[in-house]
């Protein structure tokens, strides 16, 4: 798949899986909501219940900024299956003005209760994907 197709799948997906790696090489995978803004994908630590605000994903990004995001579509009709991935470098950002704006355009919940962060900004270095329809 070309990068434009993969990037387009991120425009229709509502949730992604963020993959980070800790300093010992152990993977960590969590679902996130996100917004694409050019070549940057934004996400936020928001008010949804969490055991702590000191999240493993934030520590992992500080230790190793290389991350992957995966979106996918499943259907019982396997000719409809697809997945798309964005690989890039993430950074934790406390000033989330750009992220809040992008996320609020995509998710009505953030218009009512904007996240207070911290925020994650991922500069995408590679878009890739697969679709059963295209083999």
State what each model feature region is:
Residues 1, 52, 73-135:
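Charged, gly/pro-rich active-site loop segments
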Residues 1-17:
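Short, basic/aromatic recognition patches
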Residues 11-13, 26-27, 83, 113-115:
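Short solvent-exposed loop/turn micro-motifs enriched in small/polar/acidic residues
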Residues 13-50, 69-71:
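Short beta-strand segments
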Residues 55:
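Structured soluble/peripheral alpha/beta segments that form catalytic or ligand/cofactor-binding pockets
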Residues 64-67:
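Short coil-to-beta transition motif at edge beta-strands of beta-rich domains
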């Amino acid at each position: 798949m070309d990068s434009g197709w993969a990037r387009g799948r991120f425009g229709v997906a509502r949730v992604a899986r963020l993959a980070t790696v800790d300093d010992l090489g152990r993977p960590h995978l969590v679902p996130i909501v996100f917004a694409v803004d050019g070549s940057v994908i934004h996400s936020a630590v928001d008010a949804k219940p969490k055991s702590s605000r000191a999240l493993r994903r934030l520590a992992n990004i500080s230790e190793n900024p290389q991350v992957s995001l995966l979106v996918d579509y499943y259907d019982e009709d396997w000719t409809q299956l697809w997945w798309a991935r964005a690989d890039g470098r993430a950074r934790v950002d406390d000033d989330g003005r750009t992220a809040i704006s992008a996320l609020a355009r995509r998710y009505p919940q953030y218009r009512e209760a904007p996240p207070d962060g911290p925020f994650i900004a991922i500069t995408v270095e590679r878009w890739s994907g697969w679709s059963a329809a295209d083999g």
